[in-house]
Amino acid sequence: MFIELTEVITAGITAGHKRQISINTNRIISFAPVESGEGTTIEVKRGNIRVKETYEEIKELIA
């Protein structure tokens, strides 16, 4: 199953921009609330993705 989220780009020349992404929930290793600020960090095989949605919203989408 895929879920659609809003990625917050955190590095490079486009840092701070947002874009819509689709993630296969089978590929998610873990997710945790961002320590400073809003959003959630999602860990996938190729690295981490920071999204605008809260930890609770992601938990509901995956369940």
Region roles according to the model:
Residues M1-A63:
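Acidic, Ser/Thr- and proline-rich intrinsically disordered linker/docking segments
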